[in-house]
């Protein structure tokens, strides 16, 4: 199967991200307006950032692709999205109470450097809300999707398991809480049908990911909190 370039596949995350489930996660995890400045990493076309700002959040974003930023402004007006190279965040220490990212963590080659920067810009006791695919379930899907055991690694270079997420975040001073968010939405069924066909939909009825144990969920919804200094 012909594969789109890695940068193209990453840019499509805004269209193919599980938007409905991401919103539910933020609500259930207790992210409320008035909690202080919020940074979205990987704003894409600005859909989530626009919603957060309309709901009263003091939110801004960063994005690696200038064309995506231009598209966000065409769709939603002059959103406060800065272009960054992805390695560093152009903000002062302790600038944000909250950081969020969706379908971004798995694309970052050096997740330790990423978490170091997130920790730096978060205020003491701040929170990082993120959604990222499960390493074990995603590898199976992507192998079938691309008909290759290695092609997906170019794009999803930093997939993590449940245990690996807990360990990596703990190394940077985070306490992690995983949320059980249903993912079998209309978008999810569309994706299964597109890439796996009717057999995939039939398999979905037998093995519904929403019924899997937390460590085997197709996507991890993580609330990572920095400990407050004593």
Residue ranges and their predicted role:
Residues 103-107:
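A short His-aromatic
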């Amino acid at each position: 199967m012909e594969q789109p370039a890695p940068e193209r596949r990453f840019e499509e995350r805004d269209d193919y991200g599980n938007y409905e489930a991401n919103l539910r996660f933020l609500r259930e995890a207790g992210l409320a307006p008035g909690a202080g400045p919020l940074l979205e990493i990987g704003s894409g076309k600005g859909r989530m950032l626009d919603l957060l700002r309309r709901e009263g959040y003091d939110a801004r974003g960063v994005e690696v692709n200038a064309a995506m930023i231009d598209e966000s402004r065409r769709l939603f007006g002059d959103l406060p999205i800065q272009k960054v190279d992805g390695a560093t965040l152009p903000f002062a220490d302790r600038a944000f109470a909250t950081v969020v990212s969706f379908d971004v963590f798995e694309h970052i080659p050096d997740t330790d450097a990423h978490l170091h920067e997130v920790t730096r810009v978060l205020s003491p006791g701040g929170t990082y809300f993120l959604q990222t695919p499960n390493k074990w379930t995603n590898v199976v899907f992507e192998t079938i999707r691309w008909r290759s055991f290695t092609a997906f690694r170019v794009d999803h270079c930093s997939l993590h398991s449940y245990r690996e997420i807990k360990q990596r975040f703990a190394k940077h001073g985070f306490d992690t809480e995983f949320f059980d968010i249903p993912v079998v939405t209309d978008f999810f069924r569309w994706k299964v049908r597109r890439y796996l066909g009717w057999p995939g939909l039939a398999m979905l009825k037998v093995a519904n990911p929403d019924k899997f144990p937390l460590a085997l969920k197709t996507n991890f919804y993580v609330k990572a909190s920095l400990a407050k200094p004593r």
